[in-house]
């Protein structure tokens, strides 16, 4: 390792381009904007009769999910396939890790099979970072969610959703509501919104579900949902992550819905053109009313669509020396 290697962020290569994608912390507005611009270009691929481009032909992407997932795992698979990569999805319950093999040894064996990229989801915060520190130099690592720490591709698909529906971030008020304490999505969203210039970021929830140190994110904290929703442009609802909770944080789900559930009446306190988002899975009647989740202001299904494009952008940028945007343009020109 050279002195420059020691100083350079693990996520970036010598040219300041993506090498791994582990967290949004410390990434520049320019790089985040490039990811969004590239994802915008890939949205067009999803409208084609043949939804494929050859950018990662001959490359192998391994999805290694140690936590259950539907949207994230499936959209990463679709993203890699649309880029023409070969995709391996490791079923952890039937893999050698269930027989006592360590995560490190499992990944070393997959590396020996010439995998080019790992998409990792793990219950432990920092797991993806640990793996990125120990893989071969030519292998990329993408964080598909690690503990409470980060979910960077979810953060970016949320930003793409906001940008496509609101045009930008400079004049927006965004409210993030619910279980902030256990949410890696909330952390990634707050980092991205701040980096992209959103002037008013609000977090709303009971004191027992708000972490210490929120001031470092430049947010305003509300404990009253009605007050916090006043005149916001974007509402991001979060589910109660009861699997990560210890007892005593909430009196009941019913009480939580009474105080912090998003109903049609409560949504009326936001701007008339406000959009409603949710990373899923939705708990109807716990954090959000069905009439809101399925209503005209909901863009929840759009988030899923945009997630494929964002993950295509991240996969291609992390595995490429040039911008994916430039590659996509070149590929399109060759077809003309």
Swiss-Prot record:
Keyword Nuclease: no
Catalytic activity from the UniProt record: carbamoyl phosphate + L-aspartate = N-carbamoyl-L-aspartate + phosphate + H(+)
Chain positions recorded as L-aspartate binding sites: 99, 184, 239
Keywords: Pyrimidine biosynthesis, Transferase
GO-annotated biological processes: 'de novo' pyrimidine nucleobase biosynthetic process; 'de novo' UMP biosynthetic process; amino acid metabolic process
InterPro entries: Asp/Orn_carbamoyltranf_P-bd (IPR006132), Asp/Orn_carbamoylTrfase (IPR006130), Asp/Orn_carbamoylTrfase_sf (IPR036901), Asp_carbamoyltransf (IPR002082), Asp_carbamoyltransf_Asp/Orn-bd (IPR006131)
Protein residues bound to carbamoyl phosphate: 71-72, 121, 151, 154, 280-281
Superkingdom of this protein's organism: Bacteria
Gene Ontology CC terms, in alphabetical order: cytosol
A GO molecular-function descriptor: aspartate carbamoyltransferase activity
Keyword field contains Transferase: yes
Functional pathway: Pyrimidine metabolism; UMP biosynthesis via de novo pathway; (S)-dihydroorotate from bicarbonate: step 2/3
Catalytic activity, EC: 2.1.3.2
Subunit structure: Heterododecamer (2C3:3R2) of six catalytic PyrB chains organized as two trimers (C3), and six regulatory PyrI chains organized as three dimers (R2).
Function: Catalyzes the condensation of carbamoyl phosphate and aspartate to form carbamoyl aspartate and inorganic phosphate, the committed step in the de novo pyrimidine nucleotide biosynthesis pathway.
Alphabetized HAMAP family for the sequence: Asp_carb_tr
Family: Belongs to the aspartate/ornithine carbamoyltransferase superfamily. ATCase family.
Protein name according to UniProt: Aspartate carbamoyltransferase catalytic subunit
Organism: Azotobacter vinelandii (strain DJ / ATCC BAA-1303)
């Amino acid at each position: 390792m050279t002195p420059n290697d020691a100083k350079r962020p693990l996520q970036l290569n010598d040219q300041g381009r993506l090498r791994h994608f582990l967290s949004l912390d410390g990434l520049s507005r320019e790089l985040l904007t490039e990811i969004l611009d590239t994802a915008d270009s890939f949205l067009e691929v999803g409208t084609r009769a043949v939804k494929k481009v050859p950018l990662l032909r001959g490359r192998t992407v391994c999805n290694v999910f140690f936590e259950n997932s539907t949207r994230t795992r499936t959209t990463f698979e679709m993203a890699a396939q649309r880029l023409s990569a070969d995709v391996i999805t490791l079923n952890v319950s039937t893999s050698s890790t269930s027989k006592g093999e360590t995560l490190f040894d499992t990944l070393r064996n997959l590396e020996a099979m010439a995998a080019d990229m790992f998409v990792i989801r793990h219950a432990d915060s920092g797991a993806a970072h640990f793996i990125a520190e120990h893989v071969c130099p030519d292998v990329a690592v993408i964080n598909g969610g690690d503990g409470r720490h980060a979910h960077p591709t979810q953060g970016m698909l949320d930003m793409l959703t906001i940008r496509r529906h609101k045009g930008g971030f400079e004049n927006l008020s965004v409210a993030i509501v619910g279980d902030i304490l256990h949410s890696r999505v909330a952390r990634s969203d707050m980092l991205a919104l701040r980096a992209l210039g959103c002037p008013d970021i609000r977090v709303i929830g009971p004191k027992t579900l708000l972490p210490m140190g929120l001031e470092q994110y430049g947010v305003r904290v509300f404990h009253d949902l009605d007050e916090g929703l006043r005149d916001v442009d974007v509402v991001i609802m979060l589910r109660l992550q009861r699997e990560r909770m210890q007892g005593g944080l909430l009196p009941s789900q019913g009480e939580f819905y009474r105080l912090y559930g998003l109903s049609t009446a409560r949504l009326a306190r936001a701007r008339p053109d406000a959009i409603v988002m949710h990373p899923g899975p939705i708990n109807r009647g716990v954090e959000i009313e069905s009439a809101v989740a399925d209503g005209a202001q909901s863009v929840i299904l759009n988030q899923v669509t945009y997630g494929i494009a964002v993950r295509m952008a991240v996969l291609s940028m992390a595995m490429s020396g040039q911008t994916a945007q430039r590659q996509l343009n070149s590929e399109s020109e060759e077809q003309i």
